[in-house]
Amino acid sequence: DRDGSIEVQSDETLGHLSDWLSLKTMALRQLNNLSAKSQLDVGQRLKLDFSRVGRREFEEKRLAYHKNVQDRFFKQFHVVKTETLTLKEGDSAWLLAQRYRVPMWLLRQYNSTLNFNLVGTGTTLTVPQVKKQPN
């Protein structure tokens, strides 16, 4: 955003973000008041330091990373159908992704209008069903 912050996406780590910014991980931890043991959550907002790398270069590196993750996935799997499911008590989007063996980034793509920070019991999700690509 204009304030120099981003929303953490699936599969991103503090190490990735630091690399893309040419910063030490500790610098990002300090900027965001994160302890050494803190884990990033998808959807979490983080302040970034663009003093060494411009926003455009950062975004190019970030997009290339995500494209690579998706390309590798689709070389192995393809979506055969989708199913609409409603979360029950004790369910979460993460558990659903685990149960159906789909990455969170793919589940988020199929439910792009949902705020995943607010997903809970009663939320309806479209779940892609994947199958291994034939050799």
Each model region followed by its residue ranges:
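Extracytoplasmic low-complexity/disordered linkers and repeat tracts associated with LysM-containing
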Residues: 1-135
